[in-house]
């Protein structure tokens, strides 16, 4: 229709409908390819379409380039914003804060706040573990370098501290990559269609991990499965692991597991499914609980990076079948290996 020039009014109507239904509310994670008999990844198409929205030289592209070149500063700026939001939550209360931010989202398209929004967090030099024979390079994701626990979180330590504690108990010395604050796997830019910027960040990260791992001598652990999925696609010469896989493969025999009888739910992320690691997460969960519940018909959670903030209706729809199952099964706590999913 675009080539022929026929019915331009219908073309504009269809294009506008697709902008929302096919682009803005596409998670872009490619999980659709696993259920498609032809293995078609519509997420790749979405990235290409988004790429055309941000051509080099456009305002959006220049903003993305600036963020990539000043990433440490961007994260430093985000931390006080999170602290301010947490202070407002404490002052106003959950109900009032939710009402105000929903109105702001509806009126101006500002990111939607939720009660599970985490506080700010920063890794300290004192967090590093002492010298040991076994070594692992730990690259905490951008999210976990910046975001800690929510105000009413049921746990008392951020993920990074928990991971460091486990590694130390198992006899592993942790090596952080040099200049970690400015590093990123590139998923942020890939999801926006800025593929060349994403690749440049991947190249930068690979060089830092190659140095930290002493040219691949030590394994590399990244604590977010979507980040690891991209890293495995772009970094070939280093052994890369996500937390459940690393714990189950290397730490299982070095730690003592005492399973609880409390039932727990497990959410398997899109990237874990695509990497074939779902059974490892389930097996690890079964070492920790005698009752592991896997919700049915809950695939992608719909958060998709920032979609849970900018298009919260996607998140709501994706998880519409979750709460009834948890209530029926009497599940009071759930686990996953992606911080944004916890939100």
List PLM regions with ranges.
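Secondary-structure capping and boundary motifs in well-ordered enzyme cores
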Residues: 14-28, 132-135, 155, 159
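Ferredoxin-type iron-sulfur electron-transfer modules and their immediate structural context
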Residues: 1-26, 35-37, 42-45, 51-58, ...
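Short metal-coordination and nucleic-acid-contact micro-motifs, chiefly zinc-binding Cys/His arrays
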Residues: 19-22, 28-32, 181, 297
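Short, well-ordered helical secondary-structure segments
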Residues: 13-19, 27, 126, 172, ...
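Iron-sulfur cluster-binding electron-transfer modules in prokaryotic oxidoreductases
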Residues: 43-341
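Cys/His-rich metal-chelating microdomains
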Residues: 29-35, 39, 188, 304
């Amino acid at each position: 229709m675009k080539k022929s020039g026929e019915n331009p009014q219908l073309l504009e109507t269809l294009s506008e409908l697709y902008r929302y239904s096919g682009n803005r509310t596409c998670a872009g994670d490619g999980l659709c390819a696993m259920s498609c008999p032809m293995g078609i990844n519509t997420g790749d198409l979405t990235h290409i379409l988004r790429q055309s929205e941000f051509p080099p030289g456009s305002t959006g592209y220049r903003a993305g380039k600036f963020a990539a070149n000043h990433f440490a500063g961007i994260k430093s700026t985000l931390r006080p914003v999170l602290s301010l939001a947490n202070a407002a939550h404490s002052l106003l209360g959950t109900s009032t804060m939710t009402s105000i931010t929903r109105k702001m989202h509806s009126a101006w398209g500002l990111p939607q706040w939720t009660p599970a929004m985490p506080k700010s967090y920063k890794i300290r030099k004192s967090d590093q573990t002492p010298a040991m024979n076994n070594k692992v390079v730990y690259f905490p994701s951008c999210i976990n370098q910046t975001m800690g626990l929510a105000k009413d979180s049921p746990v008392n330590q951020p993920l990074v501290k928990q991971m460091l504690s486990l590694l130390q108990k198992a006899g592993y010395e942790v090596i952080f990559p040099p200049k970690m604050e400015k590093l990123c796997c590139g998923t942020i830019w890939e999801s926006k269609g800025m593929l060349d910027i994403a690749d440049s960040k991947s190249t930068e990260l690979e060089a830092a991990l190659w140095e930290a791992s002493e040219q691949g001598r030590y394994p590399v652990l990244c604590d977010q499965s979507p980040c690891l999925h991209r890293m495995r696609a772009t970094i070939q010469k280093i052994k890369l692991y996500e937390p459940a896989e690393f714990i189950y493969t290397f730490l299982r025999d070095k730690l003592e597991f005492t399973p609880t009888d409390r039932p727990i739910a497990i959410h398997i992320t899109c990237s874990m499914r695509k990497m074939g690691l779902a059974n490892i997460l389930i097996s690890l969960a079964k070492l920790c609980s005698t009752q592991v519940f896997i919700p049915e018909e809950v695939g992608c959670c719909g958060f998709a990076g920032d979609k849970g903030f900018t298009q919260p209706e996607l998140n709501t729809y994706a998880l519409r079948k979750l709460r009834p199952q948890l209530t029926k099964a009497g599940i009071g706590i759930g686990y996953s290996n992606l911080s944004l999913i916890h939100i």
